C-alpha cells in the first residue's frame, strides 16, 4: 500500500483548521489512511500516512487528504468544482508511437504559489501515482515542466536513439541510448522502451526537449522550483483511461494549491481530444441495497447527506433509486458496494454498534484437512521430514529441469520475476529444487510435501482447479524403486486401499524403473527412480527415488 509523508501544518493550511495529533489520527480515516508514524523535524511535525486503497491515487497527497477531510467535516459538500479554462496549446502525437507508448494527455496549470511543502507534495504525488497506479511507470508516467520555458505547439514524437539532450540533473548532452545506459533513471526504467525501434520524446516548437517518457525530464524545462508559477503536465502510457485519470489527479491537486487549470488539445493521427476532462461520472444506486448491506436504518435523505460529505452529487429518482455523480479524479466506483463503502466511512465505522453473529451451527474442522494432517503424521512416522515450498514456480522448474515436454499451465500475466511466473502443476519439481539447495547437508535426505497443484480445467468458471497432492522424495546412495514403494505400500495399507503399479514412460524417471499408480483402475500418481539427466540438471550427485499422488481419490 502507498505510504507518503505530509507536514501537519500543510494539512491544516489546506483544511483551514488546526487539530491535535490525536485528532488527526481519527481524521485521516476519512481519507482511507492510517497514521503510521509521527516525527518532528526543523520545528515542524510530520506524519507518515499509510493509504489503505490502491485504487484512490487522489488520496496520496496532502491536497487529496485535506480535500477529503474538508468534505467529511461538512466544510464543503457535493461535487468539488474546478474551473477549467481554454488555452491555445496543442500537442501533436506521432503515429510511430502506436506500438511504443501510444497515449499522451496534457494540461497547463497557471498561477501557482509553490513553497517547499507544496513542491514536496507535488513531486511525491507524481512518484507515487507512477509507481503504484502506473505499475512502476509501465502504464503511467508523469512529467511536470516549467511552462514559461516551453514554446507551443508541442510534439510527442518517435525519436532516433542517437538524438541528444541534457537530462535532468546533468550538465552535458547525452544520446537517448546513453541515457538508458548511464543515467540512474535510464538504468531503472530503460527496460520499458529499450527494445523499441524508436524512443518517445516530447519537444516544443523550437526543438527543445521537455522529456523522454517514461524515463527522465530535461534539465532545461523539467526542473520545477518554488519560483515556478506555471506548469505543463504530461502523462503518457498504454491505457488512455488510466492516463486521463492520472492527469485529473495531478491537476486537481494543483488546483487545491490555487492553480488555474487550462485545457490542451491533443491531436492523434486518427482522432483528437481535449484534456483534462473533469466531467463528473455517473452511477445509479439502490437505497434499499445500502440499507440492507449496511444494517443501518437510514432514510434516503440521510444517505444523500452522507454521500454529499464524500464528494457526491445525489439526485433522488424514486423511493429506492438515486443517480449519483462523483469526481473525475476517481475511477473506483464499479458497484453499489463501492458507494456503500463511502456511506459507511462518512457515517463512521466506530459509530456502528457491534453485534454478535447468530450462528445456527458450531464451527468444526474441515474433515479433509484432518485427513491431510493424518497423512502428514504417517509420513513423519515413516521417518520423513516435511517441507513446505512455494506454489509459485516457473516453466523451467516444472518442465525443462524435469526433462519433460512443456505443457499448458497457469501463468502470471506480469510476474515480478521469471522465477515466479506460473503456478505449479506438480510438486516433485519443488522437492527436487529443495534437494538441490541442500546438497551440502548429510545424506540420506527423506522429505515429503502435502500441497496444492493447480491444473487447467475448462469446465470450471475460473478455468482452473487446485488439487491436493502428496509428493515423497528419498535422496541418498543405495536408494532404489523398492524404497519408494515400501513407503507407498505402508501408506495404502494404513488407509485400507488396494492399488496397482503399471509400467509407463516418463522423462523425469529412468525407463523401466517408473510406473503409474492406479486405484480402482484410475491413475492417481507416478513412482520411480529419477533420471540421471534430471539429477544433473539439479546438480544432485546421489540417486533419488520419488512418488507423487493425488489425495482426493484416497479420501474415503
From Swiss-Prot:
Annotated Gene Ontology cellular component terms: phenylalanine-tRNA ligase complex
Source organism superkingdom: Archaea
Gene Ontology biological process terms in this record: phenylalanyl-tRNA aminoacylation
Binding site for Mg(2+): 332, 338, 341-342
Keywords: Aminoacyl-tRNA synthetase, ATP-binding, Cytoplasm, Ligase, Magnesium, Metal-binding, Nucleotide-binding, Protein biosynthesis
Any matching Pfam family: B3_4
PANTHER family: PHENYLALANINE--TRNA LIGASE BETA SUBUNIT (PTHR10947:SF0), PHENYLALANYL-TRNA SYNTHETASE BETA CHAIN AND LEUCINE-RICH REPEAT-CONTAINING PROTEIN 47 (PTHR10947)
UniProt record similarity statement: Belongs to the phenylalanyl-tRNA synthetase beta subunit family. Type 2 subfamily.
Official protein name in the record: Phenylalanine--tRNA ligase beta subunit
Organism: Pyrococcus furiosus (strain ATCC 43587 / DSM 3638 / JCM 8422 / Vc1)
